[in-house]
Amino acid sequence: MLTISKLIPQGQGLAPVLLRRASTMELDWDVRQKSRFEATDSAGRQLGVFLPRGTVVRGGDVLVAEDGSLVKVDAAPQPVLRITPCSSHGTAFDLTRAAYHLGNRHVPIELKPDHLKIEPDHVLADMLRAMHLTVLAVNEPFEPENGAYATGGHAHDHDGEPEHVHGPGCQHAH
């Protein structure tokens, strides 16, 4: 079994040719939120992944094996509930309200401009339908938010402005 103990977020800094040559593996959210797991890559190799505790693997991340080989992670399609405003009388605010109620329940949630995604839960689905939202069971990749206290952001200030923090993936320049 090949051991992996390093993660490069979104393959940052790697040449595109290296990413094209890397093996891949599809992992669902249940596995990607664990820091230790076993998996098989597209080359058929058995992998033992041992990342620092609390590490979450995202689709697009690249894992580095002990032999130097790279493995690109894809978020596997999995059963999720896709939540959208009612097409006849819903508004974008309905999604904001739904996100608030789901957040109060500490539900892992993927936020998109036009929809939300959560793991299947018939009680939550009924609650959302009662809020006049459309809830559809689909099979799609799931990338929930890290949460307000997750690590990985960066802090900086702007000439005379108070310091503030941007989350992972923020690409704007100042």
From Swiss-Prot:
One of its GO terms (molecular function) is nickel cation binding. It is found in: Cytoplasm. SMART domains: UreE_N. The keyword Transmembrane does not apply. Residues 146-174 are annotated as: Disordered. Residues 154-166 have a biased composition (Basic and acidic residues). InterPro entries: UreE (IPR012406), UreE_C_dom (IPR007864), UreE_N (IPR004029), UreE_N_sf (IPR036118). Gene3D superfamilies: Urease metallochaperone UreE, N-terminal domain, UreE, C-terminal domain. HAMAP family: UreE (MF_00822). Involved in urease metallocenter assembly. Binds nickel. Probably functions as a nickel donor during metallocenter assembly. This is Urease accessory protein UreE. The lineage of its organism: Bacteria, Pseudomonadati, Pseudomonadota, Betaproteobacteria, Burkholderiales.
